[in-house]
Amino acid sequence: LFQPAVNYNYYQQLNGYKYLKSLGIGYHFFRGKYITAIPEILDTTKKTLIHIPAVQGRDSYADKYQQVADIIATIGEVVGEEPEHFIKIVRTPDGKILRVGDLVEDNIPQRRALQAYLQRMNSRDALDILIALGTAKEGFDWQWCEVCLTVGIRASLTEVVQIIGRCT
């Protein structure tokens, strides 16, 4: 029985991304809850995908909604929302206004509206930060993304490359 297989090495996969111009992989260590390290790691001047750990993962400290709420609270204060796209408008402590998307939400119509928005974005200013869980590996590409912040232990480098692929 013939079973076709397609294999790529990391170079081939990364080389195939349309917008990826360079790649740097860094790491940060934290003790306790990862949320305490977010303020020193997150650069709100850069377009960032934050990939939170799986709820059953060792680095998860609360349910996924609480983790998202804590990340947003770390960024600043929610001052509004775009109900048609489910983008939160967040004011940072220094007064900067950021547009934050939440793909962790289980509400299907809400998540689909945000995913559709991500596919239609045609401006760098359309989004500043995107928080995701499993969808960080599939379903959208964000050409203006500058940083992927992946929290916790991942099963493989392949999973990390898949997440990086959303930002290409």
Which residues fall in each region the model found?
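Interdomain hinge/linker at the junction between the two RecA-like core domains of SF2 helicases
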Residues: 2-40
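Short secondary-structure boundary/capping segments
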Residues: 12-15, 66-71, 145-149, 164-166
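Conserved C-terminal RecA-like helicase domain
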Residues: 29-138, 154-155
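Short glycine-/polar-rich loops that comprise or flank the Walker A/P-loop
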Residues: 44-46, 143-147
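Short, solvent-exposed loop/turn and secondary-structure capping segments
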Residues: 61-62, 141-143, 159-162
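Conserved SF2 helicase motif VI
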Residues: 155-168
